[in-house]
Swiss-Prot record:
Protein's UniProt name: Chaperonin GroEL
InterPro entries from the UniProt entry: Cpn60/GroEL, Cpn60/GroEL/TCP-1, GROEL-like_equatorial_sf, TCP-1-like_intermed_sf
BP terms from Gene Ontology: protein refolding
Purpose of the protein: Together with its co-chaperonin GroES, plays an essential role in assisting protein folding. The GroEL-GroES system forms a nano-cage that allows encapsulation of the non-native substrate proteins and provides a physical environment optimized to promote and accelerate protein folding.
Binding residues for ATP: D23, G24, T25, T26, T27
Protein location: Cytoplasm
Keyword Cytoplasm included in the entry's annotation: yes
Name of the coding gene: groEL
Quaternary structure and interacting proteins, as annotated: Forms a cylinder of 14 subunits composed of two heptameric rings stacked back-to-back. Interacts with the co-chaperonin GroES.
């Protein structure tokens, strides 16, 4: 039963990450698994579960604060293309994404579907 609870927790973490960020599910899953593994190890060694939870919450606050301080706004078409190219691992895809975003604007929606056609 504990394994099922853990699996459900990791699924929820991945889903929430995808809903909020649209990316990062693998990283979130690895982090969740590490938190559960190390948390259980510490509790088994005698750590207070509530103290452990509070420590994790403080660490999350500090990490979030640090990430927000170092975050950079992506505003220009060139910045969007560069960011998208890194994410996609392909300069041409980055350019296409930037072009699509330029056309639909900040409030627009871009839908990507798999195709049986070869090429872009």
């Amino acid at each position: 039963p504990y394994e099922k609870i853990g699996a459900e927790l990791v699924k929820e973490v991945a889903k929430k990450t995808d809903d909020v960020a649209g990316d990062g599910t693998t990283t979130a899953t690895v982090l969740a698994q590490a938190l559960v593994r190390e948390g259980l190890r510490n509790v088994a060694a005698g750590a207070n579960p509530l103290g452990l939870k509070r420590g994790i919450e403080k660490a999350v606050e500090k990490i979030t604060e640090t990430l927000l301080k170092s975050a950079k706004e992506v505003e220009t078409k060139d910045q969007i293309a560069a960011t998208a190219a890194i994410s996609a691992g392909d300069l041409q895809i980055g350019e296409l994404i930037a072009e699509a975003m330029d056309k639909v604007g900040n409030e627009g929606v871009i839908t990507v579907e798999e195709s049986q056609t070869f090429g872009l």
